[in-house]
């Protein structure tokens, strides 16, 4: 356990940051799942509304991943990998080459 005041503060800060990062990562996972679900919905029933759902959820997911990378919650390669996987799935769902 920490003995001095500054070490105790650092422990508190590390715990606070851990919880914030955990929340951020959870939100990234949730938006990724939502994007993939919307892609599946579009595959089953291709129409303009479902296309808009896919596009908006894709933009939100990419935006949040970029913000997580900027805040050092995710490593830049990890963020790029996540975006690549999502984009690959979306392109196959929308039949884009």
Curated annotation (Swiss-Prot):
Taken from the UniProt entry, a GO cellular component term is: cytosol
Enumerate the GO terms in the molecular function aspect. small ribosomal subunit rRNA binding; structural constituent of ribosome
UniProt superkingdom: Bacteria
Keywords from the named record: Ribonucleoprotein, Ribosomal protein, RNA-binding, rRNA-binding
Record keywords: rRNA-binding included? yes
The record, for Gene3D superfamilies, names: Ribosomal protein S20 (1.20.58.110)
The record, for Pfam families, names:
Ribosomal_S20p
GO BP, sorted A to Z: translation
The residues that cross the membrane are: none
Looking up NCBIfam families in the UniProt record yields: S20
Q: What does this protein do?
A: Binds directly to 16S ribosomal RNA.
Q: Which family does it belong to?
A: Belongs to the bacterial ribosomal protein bS20 family.
Name used for this protein in its record = Small ribosomal subunit protein bS20
- What organism, scientifically named, is this protein from? Prochlorococcus marinus (strain MIT 9215)
